[in-house]
């Protein structure tokens, strides 16, 4: 193996002529040269570089260079300053005996050292600190250290120090104090604030030791508790900052500002090191998400994360306690969710919240580039749904109050009769067997309810528009949602609480109408309820690349069509009667039943396929749906013919068709 060696400044330069077997690597050119003499050398040269050098030179000296100290008497080298000091103390005492007094201000060497420290660690604050040392009775090798500012002597902070720490600090203040190991008298010294250590060593006293302070003093001590855990005495919850625990007590426990200090308990952090520094850097609670505890750099990033990720929760009233309890509503006021939901909408409609023409939100003073972005912001952040007719809000406040009441009104579970669900194109819309059977039982009651509503419809056309809207609102809610079963018939979703169903209804409401959102394929007439179905359809049927999908995906939301609930229910009613007439021949009503046959569910389930590389689908020319097997496609085409020739007369003459015959 060839020898890889670099030249040294003092070595004799062999050029490899005597040793042809080994190849020497050419050395670093500065190491081959003799040292250049400059006007200043040693520490003076470094000080001059920090005083008048470039930014790059300062960076090299601070970050990329290690210092080796050389004793001028014995030429010994030391990599650390403490080793050099110990060496000079015991083996090579300095040539000039220094007295114990402070150095003269006019001394050039001390002035140069001060300039060096000022250049490396520029002091932002010139405030002085007072250090008080108190002896410990049980331990003679350590003292209590109290640090306070001269401008505010009330704020006294306490930290314990190790013997090495106390020795260094006492040597700086006076040499006589360092010779006595047990400290008997308390001494007060005025020192300059160190750059980092004092800030991290500061810890706040407990609530018993600290006197009552003003609100300004409370705000200044927000970030001084990095080494301690703050505990709420009422619920024993831990916090990292005083601001977080004060906000928690004020919002959750409803305590006044004057009583906050009584409910805060301070406990030392167990993972704190011996010098008082915390091992883990604690992120302030105000910059972390209260739901998922993810930390961010700024509060604006926390708000943006909360609006986009946790969009179902209210940002202004959310707290970690309420967010983690599953059954408790997210409102801080102790009122029912239905009432609070209603009052919130009424309160929001009492004044102008937005300006559609200027695309500006008047609640948080934000301006947006388009009305779509403003509507999205109002729906996600403020939970206000805007429609095209909502721009008249500012002109007629009375009408807005009525319309908001109509929009929010939820019928009680006792008075609402449930009706069967509606079926759309989405293949995930198949029902569980229990839900399907339950809703088949409720079908006659729902149709009786429909007959009653039809008989009352002439009365609903009264001169007052608000009353008419209220009358027509009830059947729409009951047609799309089952408040007894807590079930959305449009999405086939079951909810655990009435509040969750109420929040879900907001997603289906636009002004005074209930709609169902459909995503449409931009290349054909295919449309579905789910966005991922459109993406799958474009990939499998139209054979488009992922690059094309990246362009199309953003516009799918804009192309989405909001169809009213009547359109969805009527569409299912057209598809269903031919099957329901055969199955329920004893029913007295004509084909208005919305419950479909299981045959159509099976046909829709057949379109869900697993795509592989060696795979070809059978596509329908009429609607663009693709099927894995040809039998599924032929069966699907029969449904098109059945829908085209669907009439009451044809249904009577037609025989009963079963699933086994259809699939043969």
Curated annotation (Swiss-Prot):
The modification Phosphoserine is found at residues 317, 336, 422, 426, 455, 457, 460, 462. One of its GO terms (biological process) is endocrine pancreas development. GO terms for cellular component: nucleus. InterPro entries: Znf-C2H2_11, ZNF800, Znf_C2H2_sf, Znf_C2H2_type. GO terms for molecular function: DNA binding; DNA-binding transcription factor activity; zinc ion binding. There is a cross-link at residue 409 (Glycyl lysine isopeptide (Lys-Gly) (interchain with G-Cter in SUMO1)). Keywords: DNA-binding, Isopeptide bond, Metal-binding, Nucleus, Phosphoprotein, Repeat, Transcription, Transcription regulation, Ubl conjugation, Zinc, Zinc-finger. A zinc finger (C2H2-type) spans 69-91, 230-253, 287-310, 357-382, 486-508, 519-542, 618-640. There is a cross-link at residues 132, 279, 392, 409, 476, 599 (Glycyl lysine isopeptide (Lys-Gly) (interchain with G-Cter in SUMO2)). PROSITE patterns: ZINC_FINGER_C2H2_1, ZINC_FINGER_C2H2_2. The modification Phosphothreonine is found at residue 319. Residues 339-348, 653-664 have a biased composition (Basic residues). Pfam families: CCHC_ZFPM2, zf-C2H2, zf-C2H2_11, zf-C2H2_assoc2. Residues 577-591 have a biased composition (Basic and acidic residues). It is found in: Nucleus. It comes from the Eukaryota. Residues 154-224, 328-349, 388-476, 574-599, 635-664 are annotated as: Disordered. Residues 154-179, 207-224, 416-436, 458-470 have a biased composition (Polar residues). Belongs to the krueppel C2H2-type zinc-finger protein family. May be involved in transcriptional regulation. This is Zinc finger protein 800. It comes from Homo sapiens. The lineage of its organism: Eukaryota, Metazoa, Chordata, Craniata, Vertebrata.
């Amino acid at each position: 193996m060839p020898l890889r060696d670099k030249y040294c400044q003092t070595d004799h330069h062999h050029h490899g002529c005597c040793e042809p077997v080994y190849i020497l690597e050419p050395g670093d050119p500065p190491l081959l040269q003799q040292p250049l003499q400059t006007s200043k050398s040693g520490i003076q040269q470094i000080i001059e570089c920090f005083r008048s050098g470039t930014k790059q030179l300062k960076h090299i000296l601070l970050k990329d260079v290690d210092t080796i100290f050389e004793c001028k008497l014995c030429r010994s080298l030391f990599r650390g300053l403490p080793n050099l000091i110990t060496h000079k103390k015991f083996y090579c005492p300095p040539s000039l005996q220094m007295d114990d007094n402070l150095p003269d201000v006019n001394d050039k060497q001390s002035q140069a050292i001060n300039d060096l420290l000022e250049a490396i660690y520029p002091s932002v604050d010139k405030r002085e600190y007072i250090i008080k040392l108190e002896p410990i009775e049980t331990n003679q090798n350590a003292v209590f250290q109290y640090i306070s500012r001269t401008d505010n002597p009330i704020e006294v902070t306490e930290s314990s120090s190790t013997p090495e720490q106390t020795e260094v600090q006492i040597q700086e203040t006076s040499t006589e104090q360092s010779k006595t190991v047990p400290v008997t008298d308390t001494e007060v010294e005025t020192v300059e604030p160190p750059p980092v250590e004092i800030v991290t060593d500061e810890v706040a006293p407990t609530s018993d030791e600290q006197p009552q302070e003003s609100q300004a003093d409370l705000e200044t001590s927000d970030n001084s508790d990095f080494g301690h855990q703050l505990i709420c005495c009422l619920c024993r919850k831990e916090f990292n900052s005083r601001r977080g625990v004060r906000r928690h007590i004020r919002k959750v426990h409803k305590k006044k500002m004057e009583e906050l200090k009584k409910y805060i308990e301070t406990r030392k952090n167990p993972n704190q090191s011996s010098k008082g520094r915390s091992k883990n850097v604690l992120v302030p609670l105000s910059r972390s998400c209260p739901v998922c505890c993810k930390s961010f750099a700024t509060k604006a990033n926390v708000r943006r994360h909360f609006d986009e990720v946790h969009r179902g929760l209210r940002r202004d009233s959310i707290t970690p306690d309420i967010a983690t309890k599953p059954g408790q509503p997210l409102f801080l006021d102790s009122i029912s969710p239905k009432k609070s939901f209603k009052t919130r909408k009424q309160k929001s409609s009492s004044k102008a919240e937005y300006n559609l023409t200027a695309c500006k939100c008047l609640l948080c003073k934000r301006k947006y580039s388009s009305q779509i972005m403003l509507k999205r912001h109002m729906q996600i952040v403020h939970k206000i749904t805007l429609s095209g007719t909502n721009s008249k809000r500012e002109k007629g406040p009375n009408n807005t109050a009525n319309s908001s009441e109509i929009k929010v009104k939820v019928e009680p579970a006792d008075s609402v009769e449930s009706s069967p669900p509606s079926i759309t194109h989405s293949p995930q819309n198949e029902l569980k067997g229990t839900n399907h059977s339950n809703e088949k039982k409720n079908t006659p009651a729902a149709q009786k309810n429909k007959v009653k509503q039809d008989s009352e419809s002439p009365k609903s056309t009264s001169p007052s528009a608000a009353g008419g809207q209220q009358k027509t609102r009830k059947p729409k809610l009951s047609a799309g949602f089952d408040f007894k079963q807590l079930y959305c018939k449009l999405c086939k979703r079951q909810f655990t609480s009435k509040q969750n169903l109420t929040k879900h209804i907001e997603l289906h409401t636009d002004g005074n109408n209930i709609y169902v959102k459909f995503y449409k394929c931009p290349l054909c007439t295919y449309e579905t309820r789910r966005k991922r179905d459109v993406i799958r359809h474009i990939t499998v049927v139209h054979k488009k690349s992922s690059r094309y999908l990246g362009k199309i995906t953003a516009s799918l939301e804009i192309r989405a069509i909001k169809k009213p609930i009547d359109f969805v229910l009527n569409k299912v009613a057209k598809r269903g009667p031919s099957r329901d007439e055969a199955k329920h021949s004893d029913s007295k009503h004509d084909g208005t039943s919305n419950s479909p046959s299981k045959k159509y569910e099976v046909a829709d389930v057949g379109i869900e396929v697993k795509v592989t590389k060696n795979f070809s689908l059978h596509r329908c020319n009429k609607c663009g749906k693709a099927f894995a097997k040809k039998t599924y496609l032929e069966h699907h085409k029969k449904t098109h013919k059945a829908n085209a020739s669907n009439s009451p007369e044809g249904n009577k003459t037609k025989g009963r068709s079963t699933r086994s015959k259809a699939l043969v």
